[in-house]
């Protein structure tokens, strides 16, 4: 049961309905503008949106998101604290909120969705930003989670200094079917620097199982045409890699890009990324978003060469 009110004690509860959205917005975050549409579209539910209150003052909030109406909560993407609170009150309030909400939403022993937060690109060196980020990470850690990865958020705009012009060594064609793409994804998973892929493999899943899950749970859900997806080949038809340009619920994105192990180290990533960027740019989109792990230096450099700007970062934390 949510904590019950008594005087000025802390009250922890879910929203009663969409009419309490203004209350939830009492604390700020960069995704606040998406909340109303997400609720209307079934990607959020009031019972997934929780607040910690003292009187009418919101001291902490948390919310989960689903990729499609009717789906289970997929990620904890809102977790905010009132940063005017002193420690340890600030952190303890956040911990109580998370523990209360997760006990209600996720039965004991069930998997808890990953926590993800968008953060400023300079948060390591900006004292104020660092305090905000670390306070939330500490609270999440106290509920049993750990940091999985920090990621770069990247953006290409039509005014970018680098135009998406493929180099000519590769030929591109549409993906024939699910089996062809998943087979290539399976090969790319081997030796991958991507933290999410590596943790899935470390859990005991095979590269094929990881790729099947990524296709079914992510790629198959995009609303954009599958004929945007491209296989990169050498003149003799040997596949080199692939790129998945797509639209998610909010932006045009480079959803997935990979080079097969035997072809890495030859600069093919630049041509493959240019092709994916070209396809999306041809849709007259205002921006193209992408992300990659901070530790995946080769991929980060490829995006930089292609004119993508690092406008932010993100942290992902997991419960195990």
Where does each model-flagged region fall?
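Short amphipathic alpha-helix that is part of the acyltransferase structural core
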Residues: 1-37, 165-209
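Acyl-donor-binding surface of acyltransferase catalytic domains
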Residues: 1-2, 90-176, 317
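Active-site rim helix/loop that mediates acceptor-substrate recognition in acyltransferases
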Residues: 25-55, 198-234
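Conserved donor-binding loop and adjoining core beta-sheet/short helix segment
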Residues: 37-122, 235, 243-252, 260
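A structural microfeature
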Residues: 60, 149-150, 241, 312
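Conserved acetyl-CoA-binding loop-helix of GNAT-fold acetyltransferases
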Residues: 87-106, 259, 265-282, 297-305
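Conserved active-site tyrosine of GNAT-family acetyltransferases
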Residues: 136, 140, 303, 308
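Hydrophobic adenine-recognition pocket in adenosine-nucleotide-binding enzymes
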Residues: 257-259, 292
């Amino acid at each position: 049961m949510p904590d019950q009110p008594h005087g000025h004690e802390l009250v922890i509860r879910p929203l009663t309905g969409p009419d309490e959205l203004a209350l939830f917005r009492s604390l700020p975050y960069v995704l606040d503008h998406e909340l109303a549409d997400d609720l209307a579209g079934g990607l959020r539910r009031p019972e997934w949106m929780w607040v910690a209150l003292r009187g009418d003052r919101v001291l902490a909030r948390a919310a989960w998101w689903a990729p499609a109406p009717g789906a289970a909560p997929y990620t904890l993407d809102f977790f905010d604290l009132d940063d005017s609170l002193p420690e340890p009150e600030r952190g303890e309030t956040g911990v109580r909120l998370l523990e209360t909400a997760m006990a209600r939403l996720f039965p004991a022993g069930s998997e808890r969705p990953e926590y993800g937060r968008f953060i400023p690109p300079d948060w390591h060196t900006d004292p104020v930003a660092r305090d905000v980020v670390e306070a939330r990470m500490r609270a999440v850690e106290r509920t049993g989670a750990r940091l999985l990865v920090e990621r770069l958020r990247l953006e290409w705009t039509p005014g970018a200094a680098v135009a998406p012009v493929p180099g000519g060594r590769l030929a591109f064609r549409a993906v024939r079917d699910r089996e062809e793409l998943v087979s290539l994804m399976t090969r790319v998973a081997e030796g991958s620097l991507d933290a999410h892929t590596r943790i899935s493999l470390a859990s005991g899943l095979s590269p094929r199982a990881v790729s099947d899950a990524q296709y079914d749970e992510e790629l198959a859900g995009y609303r954009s045409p599958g004929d945007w997806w491209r296989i990169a080949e050498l003149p003799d038809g040997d596949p080199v890699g692939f790129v998945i340009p797509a639209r998610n619920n909010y932006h045009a994105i480079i959803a997935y890009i990979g080079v097969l192990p035997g072809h890495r180290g030859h600069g093919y990533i630049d041509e493959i990324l240019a092709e994916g960027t070209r396809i999306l740019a041809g849709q007259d989109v205002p921006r193209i978003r992408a992300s990659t792990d901070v530790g995946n230096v080769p991929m980060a450099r490829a995006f930089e060469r292609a004119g993508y700007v690092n406008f932010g970062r993100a942290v992902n934390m997991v419960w195990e």
